[in-house]
């Protein structure tokens, strides 16, 4: 089954509610129409109720969605008090009131925090920082998780792989890389991928030297100690991780080399370049970044996204909510 059809099937009857803070944006509205018509997910749109309803009614969507106007929200005072409490002395009441009136991402994240919705998708208009910052301040990371990270699902026909971290952590240390690998395994399983995780480097099993190689070797060791049940190997060059014939020469006996499907890059430079090369040269569709490690799911769109991207990331966010 195609990956998004599988996600849709798993969401039937789960009543997931995902807030889309940029509710008046045409790409968001087109995605909301499709979400209502094709899935069991309820989109919750922030914005002017009249504008949103008129648009969707013209498109033939009369029900199956919700609209919240942040400027007339009945629970606004409760939300302000909750934000002040959550920030623990770092935000006064007046500042909290102002930011919730002016910033739809903070408002949307608070809906997630309060359990009114199950997750949030934003970033069609806003920057990554504007989307992720309130999530880190309010939703925060899961217990025993020190950082969030960003993974891309790479799809071409029936092929599916996971690349991480391509979006958030610029130069993670060994502990950070190990954590990214473990969280990427969780994300991979959500997409029906049985994770075989390659810790990538310019070296395979001691063929090269340097601080970056040492970091990847140490990260692999830490990941093994934390999750001995996972199939993780490194350090591996990409050809050794992906090509069986090369793996037999460079990493004989490895349970991962030559058959990896989750690729952990040593830093954001390699990860960002790698996923874009696979997308542009290899013809893969890149879906994400999927944010990993948060207590509740919040995901960031590219400002160059289309309605299909919004639809897919909303399904992923709903799936994360159900999994958690």
List the model feature ranges, each with a label.
Residues 1-257, 262-324:
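Anion-binding alpha/beta catalytic cores of soluble intermediary-metabolism enzymes, centered on
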């Amino acid at each position: 089954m195609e990956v998004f059809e599988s996600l849709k099937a798993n969401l039937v009857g789960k009543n997931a509610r995902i807030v889309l803070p940029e509710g008046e944006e045409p790409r968001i509205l087109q995605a909301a129409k499709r979400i209502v018509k094709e899935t069991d997910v309820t989109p919750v749109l922030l914005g002017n109720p009249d504008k949103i309803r008129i648009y969707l009614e013209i498109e033939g969507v009369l029900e199956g969605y919700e609209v919240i106007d942040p400027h007339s929200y009945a629970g606004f005072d409760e939300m302000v008090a909750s934000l002040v409490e959550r920030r623990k002395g770092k935000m006064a009441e007046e500042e909290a009131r102002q930011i919730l009136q002016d910033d739809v991402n903070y408002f949307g994240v608070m809906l997630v925090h309060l359990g009114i919705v199950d997750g949030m998708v934003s970033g069609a208009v806003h920057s990554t920082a504007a989307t992720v910052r309130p999530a880190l301040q309010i939703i925060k990371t899961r217990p025993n998780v020190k950082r969030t990270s960003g993974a891309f699902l790479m799809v071409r026909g029936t092929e599916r792989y996971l690349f991480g971290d391509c979006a958030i952590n610029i130069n993670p240390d060994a502990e950070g890389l190990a954590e990214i690998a473990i969280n990427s395994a969780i994300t991979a399983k959500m997409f029906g991928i049985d994770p075989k995780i390659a810790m990538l480097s310019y070296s395979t099993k001691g063929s090269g030297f340097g601080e970056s190689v040492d970091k990847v070797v140490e990260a692999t060791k830490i990941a093994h100690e934390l999750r001995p049940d996972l199939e993780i190997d490194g350090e591996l060059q990409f050809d050794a991780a992906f090509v069986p014939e090369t793996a037999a020469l460079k990493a004989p006996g490895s349970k991962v080399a030559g058959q990896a499907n989750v690729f952990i890059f040593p830093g954001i430079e390699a990860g960002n370049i790698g996923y874009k090369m696979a997308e542009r040269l290899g013809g893969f569709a890149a879906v994400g970044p999927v944010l990993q490690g948060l207590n509740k799911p919040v995901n960031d769109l590219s400002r160059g996204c289309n309605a299909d991207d919004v639809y897919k990331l909303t399904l992923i966010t709903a799936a994360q909510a159900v999994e958690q």
